[in-house]
């Protein structure tokens, strides 16, 4: 039951992130966990990711989609490094807010970008952006999660049609029985 409720929690978090994201999200087989394409204005996530890894990657890419839409940074340059710092640090804070521990991955990921080459002034500007973005995402995600909190699982269209057909069938059967009683 705990795993099932955790799974439902993950589903609600994914749905909330989809609502918070202002760009389309596509799940496709990838060699990487995910990426945001400013040209397509779309987030692509590896279809093989699940649970906390999927949510963490979604947060990271949603952050890119909110902060770096007009980016002309080139892989490996200082601007790209700063953008990765913003996205990963924001993802860490937001994920941590929802009891998803990404510290092992996050610390290694950030170190791989050579953050020791960033000046204190650059770091200060990035940190302000990270805090503001994380706070905004958490507020929006919380609103979306609150909407889902009291919702009953929705029935599919087919389930609704079957239920209506059964009801109609009962009514017809009842009318038929009443008609048969009157005739006898």
What is each residue range found by the language model?
Residues 43-58, 77-78:
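Short pre-active-site segment immediately N-terminal to the catalytic Zn-binding motif
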Residues 95-158:
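Long, well-structured alpha-helical subdomains associated
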